[in-house]
Swiss-Prot record:
This is Polypyrimidine tract-binding protein 1. The gene is PTBP1. There is a cross-link at K65, K218 (Glycyl lysine isopeptide (Lys-Gly) (interchain with G-Cter in SUMO2)). The modification Phosphoserine is found at S16, S141, S459. Monomer. Part of a ternary complex containing KHSRP, PTBP1, PTBP2 and HNRPH1. Interacts with RAVER1 and SFPQ. It comes from Sus scrofa (Pig).
Length: 557
């Protein structure tokens, strides 16, 4: 890792980690004032630690080159997107810290992620690596008491024990967040494309429960006030999102704590919303934010669906910057710059590159762990085509469990990766990452290929041929319920049930739309069955010049 020394170079490394290693090796770690001064001043003695190699995963993570004025809360916030932080050791004299995650998997995810995205605290890049030891034990010195109080405050809020969090925060924990407001003031600079209240909600809700949002224009700048359920979430969001762009080279977030401690929302509409009061009126005279802004900027309209619509990821999804790093069930797993699905869909609809993503312009995906006996270019074209216009597909000739899928642009590739990674296809969970290739090469004339490479650049089955297509507003994660459209009048419910059970799947529910019988919902026995049915039956000829359209539904029957 560039700029990072090994965690323990046996017999050669000296300093705070050496001291830490020696103490842990000999028993529970006790950082007394004497040993602290040793760590800060006496580096002369050689030390032989255990011989675990430097890159071996551990629950304990070593953080170096911290700013001298860093708080416990800021250090803890580095681990929050990846899981629960269970212990913290601050070595401020050395500008270092150790944090312990609740699982080795969470720690591994964190280290892998920060390997590709250098974290910055107070404008200073910091360095993260595995520690040489599996467990962190601390004493009750004043420094560690502050660290433990900070941890208690964060973990109490995460577990919903707000009363305990308040009492813990009342202790002088050295956390900046302890006395701060749960309300953030957000300014969006360089507003080239409209940013809606719903896009803000979906971005910021990854860091905690958003209670209220008010948007307004002041000094010719689009601004928002956003209230979290607790100050810890506000601190976490500010640290992660301040200075980031929502879209490529524009819509920069500037975030500060508001002097207000609570927001008073009178109307639920496009300018303000109280998520705790769905009964509030819309306010007839309140102008629609997305319409007025879209008109003012002449930009493609950013989707303004329900804040809950399309926001769910499958149980396993990829943090884009980590090139498809899989994060199972991470609470608040939106890492810095990761754009939620609805905002990504908005970007894709306007052909906007999502900023800050490793290979944001790369439209080629590497799909692995495929079933080589069953996968075909056509099946991948149909499945990935739910999230964008697939240009080319190549199943690797000598490794048929791997394929390259080229989308129309990087935003569509991000959408497909975030929604499909980890889902089962032909009985195997697929793994999706960004490829190092910039495009998929067609085979040369006379080159053996066995039909494993297909060019779909001019396919009539592309769902998103027009920039700003409304189909981008109907992109949802794979689910057991499918949305059917373009059904001719002669086709009955029974006909469709028979059709969808013909590939071995079980139909558990069906209903036509009341107002439009050309559309219906059908529920399969599992998400995997629904994925297979979509692949098999999208564009199926129903007669009378009607070809069935199949997509994943946000609704259930």
């Amino acid at each position: 890792m560039d700029g990072i020394v090994p965690d323990i170079a046996v017999g050669t490394k000296r300093g705070s980690d050496e001291l830490f290693s020696a103490c842990v090796t000999n028993g529970p770690f006790i950082m007394s004032s004497n040993s602290a001064s040793t760590a800060n001043g006496n580096d002369s003695k050689k030390f032989k630690g255990d011989n675990r190699s430097a890159g071996v995963p551990s629950r304990v993570i070593h953080i170096r080159k911290l700013p001298s004025d860093v708080t416990e809360g800021e250090v803890i916030s580095l681990g929050l997107p990846f899981g629960k932080v269970t212990n913290l050791l601050m070595l401020k004299g050395k500008n270092q810290a150790f944090i312990e995650m609740n699982t080795e998997e969470a720690a591994n995810t964190m280290v892998n992620y920060y390997t590709s995205v250098t974290p910055v605290l107070r404008g200073q890049p910091i360095y993260i690596q595995f520690s040489n030891h599996k467990e962190l034990k601390t004493d009750s010195s004043p420094n560690q008491a502050r660290a433990q109080a900070a941890l208690q405050a964060v973990n109490s809020v995460q577990s919903g024990n707000l009363a305990l969090a308040a009492s813990a925060a009342a202790v002088d924990a050295g956390m900046a967040m302890a006395g701060q407001s749960p309300v953030l003031r957000i300014i969006v600079e360089n507003l080239f494309y409209p940013v809606t209240l719903d896009v803000l909600h979906q971005i910021f809700s990854k860091f905690g429960t958003v209670l209220k949002i008010i948007t307004f224009t002041k000094n010719n700048q689009f601004q928002a006030l956003l209230q979290y359920a607790d100050p810890v979430s506000a601190q976490h969001a500010k640290l992660s999102l301040d200075g980031q762009n929502i879209y490529n080279a524009c819509c920069t977030l500037r975030i500060d704590f508001s002097k207000l401690t609570s927001l008073n929302v009178k109307y639920n509409n496009d300018k303000s919303r109280d998520y705790t009061r769905p009964d509030l009126p819309s306010g007839d005279n309140q102008p629609s934010l997305d319409q007025t802004m879209a008109a003012a900027f002449g930009a493609p309209g950013i989707m303004s669906a329900s804040p809950y619509a399309g926001a769910g990821f499958p149980p396993t999804f990829a943090i884009p910057q980590a090139a498809g790093l899989s994060v199972p069930n991470v609470h608040g797993a939106l890492a810095p710059l990761a754009i939620p699905s609805a905002a990504a869909a908005a970007a894709a609809a306007g052909r906007i590159a999502i900023p800050g993503l490793a290979g944001a312009g790369n439209s080629v995906l590497l799909v692995s762990n495929l079933n080589p006996e069953r996968v075909t270019p056509q099946s991948l074209f149909i499945l990935f085509g739910v999230y964008g216009d697939v240009q080319r597909v190549k199943i690797l000739f000598n490794k048929k469990e791997n394929a390259l899928v080229q989308m129309a642009d990087g935003s569509q590739a991000q959408l497909a990766m975030s929604h499909l990674n980890g889902h089962k296809l032909h009985g195997k969970p697929v793994r999706i990452t960004l490829s190092k290739h910039q495009n998929v090469q067609l085979p040369r004339e006379g080159q053996e290929d066995q039909g494993l490479t297909k060019d779909y650049g001019n396919s009539p089955l592309h769902r998103f041929k027009k920039p700003g297509s409304k189909n981008f507003q109907n992109i949802f994660p794979p689910s057991a319920t499918l949305h059917l459209s373009n059904i001719p009048p002669s086709i009955s419910e029974e006909d469709l049930k028979i059709l969808f059970s013909s590939n071995g799947g079980i139909v558990k529910g069906f209903k036509f739309f009341q107002k439009d019988r050309k559309m219906a919902l059908i529920q399969m026995g599992s998400v995997e069955e629904a994925i297979q049915a979509l692949i098999d039956l999208h564009n199926h000829d129903l007669g009378e010049n009607h070809h069935l359209r199949v997509s994943f539904s946000k609704s259930t029957i």
